[in-house]
Amino acid sequence: MKALLDLFKQVQQNEQFDAIKIGLASPEKIRSWSYGEVKKPETINYRTFKPERDGLFCAKIFGPIKDYECLCGKYKRLKHRGVICEKCGVEVTLAKVRRERMGHIELASPTAHIWFLKSLPSRLGMVLDMTLRDIERVLYFEAYVVTDPGMTPLKKCQIMSEDDYAAKYEEFGDDFTAFMGAEGIRELLRAIDIDRDAEMLRQELKDSKSEAKIKKYAKRLKVLEAFQRSGIKPDWMIMEVLPVLPPELRPLVPLDGGRFATSDLNDLYRRVINRNNRLKRLMELRAPEIITRNEKRMLQEAVDSLLDNGRRGKAMTGANKRPLKSLAEMIKGKGGRFRQNLLGKRVDYSGRSVIVVGPQLKLHQCGLPKLMALELFKPFIFNKLELMGLATTIKAAKKLVEIQEPVVWDILEDVIREHPVMLNRAPTLHRLGIQAFEPVLIEGKAIQLHPLVCAAFNADFDGDQMAVHVPLSIEAQMEARTLMLASNNILFPSNGEPSIVPSQDIVLGLYYASREAINAKGEGMMFPDVSEVIRAYDNKMVELATRITVRITEYPKNVETGEFEKTVTRYETTVGRAILSEILPKGLPFSVLNRALKKKEISRLINLSFRKCGLRATVVFADQLLQSGFRLATRAGISICVDDMLVPKQKVDIIATAESEVKQIEQQYSSGLVTAGERYNKVVDIWGKAGDDVGKAMMDQLKVEDVTKRDGTKTTQESFNAIYMMADSGARGSAAQIRQLAGMRGLMAKPDGSIIETPITANFREGLNVLQYFISTHGARKGLADTALKTANSGYLTRRLVDVTQDLVVIEDDCGTSNGASMKALVEGGEVIEALRDRILGRVAANDIVNPETQATLYAAGTLLDEDMVEEIERLGIDEVKVRTPLTCDTRFGLCAQCYGRDLGRGTLVNAGEAVGVVAAQSIGEPGTQLTMRTFHIGGAASRAAVASSVEAKSNGTVRFTATMRYVTNGKGGQIVISRSGEVLITDDHGRERERHKVPYGATLIVKDGMVIKAGTALATWDPLTRPIITEYTGTVKFENVEEGSTVARQIDEVTGLSTLVVIDAKRRGSVTKTVRPQVKLLNEQGEEVKIAGTEHAVTIGFQVGALITVKDGQQVTVGEVLARIPTESQKTRDITGGLPRVAELFEARSPKDAGMLAEVTGTVAFGKETKGKQRLEITDMDGNKHEFLITKDKQVLVHDGQVVNKGEMIVDGPADPQDILRLLGIEALARYIVDEVQDVYRLQGVKINDKHIEVIVRQMLRRVQVVDAGDANYIVGEQVERSELLDENDRVIALGKIPATYENVLLGITKASLSTDSFISAASFQETTRVLTEAAIMGKKDGLRGLKENVIVGRLIPAGTGLAFHRARKEKDSWEAEERAALLQSEKAARAAEAEAQFADVSSTPDSDTDAS
């Protein structure tokens, strides 16, 4: 009976664990795992194919080859189960025990484990406090180490060469002991008293003053504490016993032709055994020291390469000169155990085929080829056949299916009814890459896909393939049906917009049907209802675009009753729109359809329908839109021809003008007014503008056509040109593409990204000449090459993002925090890039939102803001709202629903169990891949935004300058801006900010503070191609360090022969002048240096590298005059190529090179004494303390003497360093910086991602903190720990009435954050597997299986979605059972005590009793 139960025991034991612990195995442990010692290197007998006894495949040790059969064949069958054969020693049992039984090798000499030796930092080195170099010399028998100095002056752990040893041995004899090899190291490790050492280190840490020492001690202390806590003995890092992997995991497979394919591990084990046996023999024979020593070294090397081949020295190679694959390689990397087998399992019940379009399907259906369905649903069919009595056995059922009996098809129909299948298209970049559909059986061999889900799958029908998976269990079917059915996933999780938006021909059909034409057939007719309109249209009385009057039935929703009420209204509309009104869902007014339906409009329509009419109505509506679109596109019969590409008449003039302008620039260049770089920039600018003008002229011409009205007068109407309609509707093509067809191709980029200054003036209709064609090929090829490279990059970014966020799940409803982030509309360059409504939609209000006019509470804190609410907020002109954000959520080890807000893929508050981390990672990673794949569509045509050179007001209002704005008035009365962060605001009558414009240094202001202006007024102008250096004082120029040949060079232009002075790069100067900085001082009439007002400092104006000096020594200058110009670099085209690495850089939190410097404190700036190469900047804070900063001289300082700066303000020009922002300005500022920067990259490509996804990633980057002061908590100062863990520990400490630890935030890049997670399983499966496992083993780490990844790896349900509920229920049950058990024990104890007491009462009457009542 027990044996029968053994069959089932496997299943029960794997579900019931809550954590996995990793540690070092002691020799005793290894022996206890083993079923016997492997003594011989033989594998199997090559004649009989039976394993050799005591060899690497020995059946006695590892178990039988065949189920229930011993090796010699004496015992066969189940009845002998458990017998051990007396002849061959094999236990009669299942052959699969060969997958789990381990052996061992007793090593003749101890060997060090290479991971703990070589994995940096070397753990052995840290425990022994020796260098890796020294330990290696000892281990590989190059030196002796003193293990016991005895009474001699030698020190413990001292290293000696052989000659030293011989000399010392002469001197001291046996008074000391020194060893070579792992024995010596083992003795040292055994002698360590960890508790004492740790105590001493703690003392040292307290007393030590030097930074370096503190760092060193803390590191060693950490390792020692790890050993202390885990109870692992350090000498276990040296192995005396080597475990042998079960043979089925390193198989030997016979190939045809008598050869064998073997796993590399067998070779590696063979070497170890051979060397070990040879060493044993040598030791028995008492061979000379030098020989055994060599053999020991070889044994150490053999064990090294078995564990991690190639880690030290040359890798061991097999017969074919290929390095052997060691145990370490089996688990790491893309093909290793983790990523290949545990996270990348293959699935049965699946198939794949080419996809074709299925326009007749409903949204929740897919067409499944009959043969495929038959194969996939085989077990279900067998079951049905047996139930119906058509087959008695499975074998008979199989036969029926194989010959495809007609009854089988009926059963198949029955089986697949309401059994959803999952379709997946690789690459699965976001959760919409796998969706469930109900299968419809079809003939043929291709899967039919619904056209509307193509956008979500990013599928097209040019040969794409898709995979089908069958959910088997009832639970799986239910989840597929409720959570994954395509009709339940109609919104993108990344931005909450509909994913089932019609595209291409559907859009074209709907657009064509909803356009209106002047004087079309039957114009002005009146109809009583829509059916009459349809009749008239079918009888060719009217056209689709005819303008008519018709009565239309609508069903608006009654607010009070919630019912739909029928109303009939007269509308002036077109025939097509009236016909379309038939499919409008109840609750939407006709006015939403009464316009030309472009792609954006249709998207809005579906979104509106979803919000107002619910999911079901929307799905039906989308399907009907699809049908109508296809039908109407077919009826429209739109086609394009060469004559549709109208080349604009103005093209010749525009190009002629541009050419003359270019000539003018060339002349200016040859007369030396502009430099070569400026000339190039200006030429590119002129041609860019010319291209745009041609494009504009072409679109203007395409857009309209002449028509005659009914009364015979001429007028124009929007064009019915086929190409224009396709682009305008959003069906296919864009203005940029039409521009290349009919305008001019424009500027092209070279492969390196720089723009070729001669444009292609021809277009595709006119045709390109050979040179133009050749220039074009650059762009086309670059596109293809980029795609391949960038897809890989984007995939890697997604992988890192998923890894850092995979354990973030919504685990509770509300964490109760009142923190949040203040949201404002995002305004840049005076334009509202993202309105406030879009930023707060779907968030939860953190404070009450108050009506600014009545001061009444509009929405209470904790309200989820929906579309109507944000409309209202915007209407009232509220310009700042504080909302909850994942960044400030107080939930430990997860998030709460209130801080996250709306689940964008569902449109409601997020559910507990939603894996918001993974959704965020996918939302950011998915467009990355899309964009990278999309670069080459414009054909490399340089799309470069024309550089802005002025700024205008967009609205009426009052001008306000910000506090940071500073300007001077020059001799001509112009106001020149001299601050670098100045901004001009326009405010409305209520004083609310309407727009804000950054004004660059050196710009000329046209308006004054407080001026009332109209929209369109210019505010400021500047030269976009150079940055000026301006004087704020009047005086005579006196150059300092401006020496030709050393700090400046005279550039003589080849063409013009004119010269200018250019400051040269310090790197190109001689050593003497490297550190000096060319600058200007000003002298007054008396010849004294002009001082900065109110200080003793002389005015000094430094020149940056590359500056062109425009003044001469001794020249008189006035306020606001330009002293030098710095040309901006020639523009390169930016697409997401610049973008993807930028996103990666932000998420990796890399400090940019040449980062700008932020003020550490609030205070007043002064310049101190300059040192060589650096200038000294002092900030005196409010308490009068001075803070010094040294700044290299080539940097641009943004502040001046006497200026007051705020903490965190830029003082030295350059890109911001996220670490500085976090340190000086806090979490919110950092999050805003990262969110805005990432959004900039995506916005440039027109991709919408909700801010909260980026915030979720930032939360994960900030999840670790550094201990500043440990208090009474169990930490070391400077240690980095998980925030949630530290807060838990602090709670514990506070509860005991002790001092909690204080900490500061740490910003980690996503790779670092992934590797530093608490879960070693997750970290090991990500990157640097060996390092992670080594560290975890020493610390005896316990993985609580909190994240998704760890659970996937150990094969449990993930703790998200339905799995979260499952695990919670299981834990509750466990704790309930534990309580029950405790209660039972308690009652038993009480009963026992009562019994004992009764006994005691009996016994106490007898005087000499010594019974203990226990």
UniProtKB/Swiss-Prot annotation:
Cofactors (names): Mg(2+); Zn(2+)
Gene Ontology CC terms, in alphabetical order: DNA-directed RNA polymerase complex
Binding site for Zn(2+) 2: 815, 889, 896, 899
Enzyme category, top tier: transferase
Region (Disordered): 1395-1414
Enzyme Commission number(s) from the entry: 2.7.7.6
Cysteines joined through disulfide linkages: none
Record flagged with keyword Electron transport: no
Keyword entries, A-Z: DNA-directed RNA polymerase, Magnesium, Metal-binding, Nucleotidyltransferase, Transcription, Transferase, Zinc
Cofactor note: Binds 1 Mg(2+) ion per subunit. Binds 2 Zn(2+) ions per subunit.
InterPro entries on file: DNA-dir_RpoC_beta_prime (IPR045867), DNA-dir_RpoC_beta_prime_bact (IPR012754), RNA_pol_asu (IPR000722), RNA_pol_N (IPR006592), RNA_pol_Rpb1_1 (IPR007080), RNA_pol_Rpb1_3 (IPR007066), RNA_pol_Rpb1_3_sf (IPR042102), RNA_pol_Rpb1_4 (IPR007083)
Keyword hit for Nucleotidyltransferase: yes
GO biological process, alphabetically ordered: DNA-templated transcription
Positions contributing to Zn(2+) 1 binding: 70, 72, 85, 88
Binding site for Mg(2+): 460, 462, 464
Quaternary structure, from the entry: The RNAP catalytic core consists of 2 alpha, 1 beta, 1 beta' and 1 omega subunit. When a sigma factor is associated with the core the holoenzyme is formed, which can initiate transcription.
Protein name: DNA-directed RNA polymerase subunit beta'
Lineage: Bacteria, Pseudomonadati, Pseudomonadota, Betaproteobacteria, Burkholderiales
